[in-house]
Design a protein with these regions (language model features):
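Acidic donor-binding loop of glycosyltransferase active sites
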Residues: 265-282, 297
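Glycosyltransferase donor-sugar binding loop
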Residues: 37-40, 221-236, 254-255
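A short, well-ordered alpha-helix in the C-terminal region of glycosyltransferases
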Residues: 327, 334, 341-356, 365-368
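Active-site donor-binding acidic/aromatic loop of nucleotide-activated sugar
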Residues: 232-234, 247-257, 264
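Conserved acidic donor-binding segment of nucleotide-sugar-dependent glycosyltransferases
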Residues: 313-314, 318-325, 334-340
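Conserved donor-binding/catalytic core segment of Leloir-type glycosyltransferases
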Residues: 4, 149, 181-208, 222-224
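Membrane-proximal helix-turn-helix segments that form the acceptor-binding/catalytic region
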Residues: 23, 66-74, 94-98, 112-114, ...
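Carbohydrate-associated surface elements
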Residues: 154, 172
Length: 379
């Protein structure tokens, strides 16, 4: 069996694509190729072939490289094609026409209509129409794929009426759940992932301002690990930091390697997931909360169901109103004042990951999908 994985909007070394799925599939396949934006034309990493295409500068650029990625995909003559970005649906069936015996999997990371609806990159006058077009075209074309994988139940529900071959592969962490008490805590709070206003970045700064006004927390340290989602967000946050004298309290690392993210989490006391109540965030499950839990740090997260249910199931953190910076600040202080509570919730998080919310069970589902499509016996 030969597998070809396609992406236009992610790094070939994206956590879900490379570290989780591709590495798991090595258990049943020794010929895996990932084609995606990369500055090297060809490289083999951990036995997986990486074939680079030019990195698009923006969303529009991702559409311009569609023909190229499909041409390269067809050259692979793979048995199973697995693609990860919405725009590829418009060209993916060319693979079927050239290679009628191949199987095609669409991996839906997001609720794309909601994503467009809240996107600052889509001009407001055409946002509603674009949302409708994305919704209708995605469902219509997806009927023709052999399998649809989603990252959560809410997105799966969109596709249940158009396909019987839909499965949730949660983006649970692959990190081993280990608490490392030997690492010195350098940061009081961490937020890891893409930094945007919608994900609560400005609310975090407002909470830090409140905490800093208390002499007990004047030296509080907050680290953001990840890239800014868009330039305007960076401008807004930097302006707020400057106007409120928070330069000594806030650290931005930018994008860091997958393995380094874990080191920052170990060096932090509390993990934040303060996503604002946008429609998309009532459906999608943020991966970062599982990664915090796997490192034994309590989670302070928004009240939306995909976040709340994982926090409350194991008492691994505190649920807050993300629109209320006072609520955020008070609950950060509550944890910082109580080391026993931090330890208790951190230990609960490790238990949750070890027993339930881990990649191992998702790996089994993924491999079974490939076995069915590839005609591989379970014996």
């Amino acid at each position: 069996m030969k597998i070809c994985i396609l992406t236009t909007g992610h790094s070939p070394f994206d956590s879900r694509i490379f570290y989780k799925q591709a590495n798991s599939l090595k258990k049943i396949c020794d010929d895996i190729t990932i084609i995606g934006p990369y500055d090297k034309e060809f490289e083999i990493v951990s036995g997986i072939k990486i074939k680079g295409i030019p990195k698009p500068k923006d969303l529009k650029g991702r559409f311009f490289i569609l023909d190229l990625i499909i041409e390269k995909a067809i050259e692979e003559r793979a048995d199973i094609y697995h693609f990860h970005d919405f725009e590829i649906i418009y060209k993916a069936l060319r693979i079927r026409r050239k290679l009628p015996n191949s199987k095609i999997i669409y991996d839906v990371h997001e609720h794309y209509p909601d994503m467009v609806r809240m996107s600052k990159k889509v001009p407001k006058p055409i946002r509603a129409l674009t949302t409708l077009m994305v919704d209708k075209s995605e469902l219509f074309i997806s009927k023709k794929f052999d399998f649809i994988i989603t990252a959560d139940e809410a997105v799966k529900d969109r596709f249940n009426n158009i396909s019987e071959s839909v499965e949730v592969i949660h983006n649970y962490t692959q990190f081993n759940a280990i608490k490392n008490d030997l690492i010195k805590k350098e940061y009081d709070i961490i937020y890891q992932g893409g930094i945007t206003i919608e994900r609560g970045a400005l609310q975090i700064l407002k909470a830090i301002k409140i905490l800093k006004s208390n002499p007990k927390y004047e030296n509080i340290k907050m680290v953001f690990v990840g890239p800014f989602g868009y330039a305007k967000c960076k401008d807004i946050l930097m302006k707020y930091i400057s106007e409120n004298d928070l330069e000594s309290n806030i650290i931005f690392t930018g994008r860091v390697d997958h393995d380094i993210v874990r080191e920052y989490m170990y060096k932090s006391k509390i993990g934040l997931v303060p996503l604002l109540p946008e429609p998309k965030y009532f459906k999608n499950i943020p991966t970062k909360q599982f990664e915090y839990m796997s490192c034994g740090i309590p989670v302070i997260g928004s009240y939306m169901p995909p976040i709340k249910r994982y926090i409350t199931a194991y008492n691994s953190g505190i649920v807050i109103n993300p629109l209320d910076e006072v609520d955020i600040a008070e609950n950060i202080a509550k944890l910082l004042m109580d080391e026993d509570l931090i330890k208790c919730m951190g230990d609960n998080g490790i238990k949750a990951i070890s027993e339930e919310f881990n990649w191992k069970q998702e790996e089994e589902k993924l491999i079974n999908i490939y076995k069915v499509l590839g005609g591989i016996s379970n014996e």
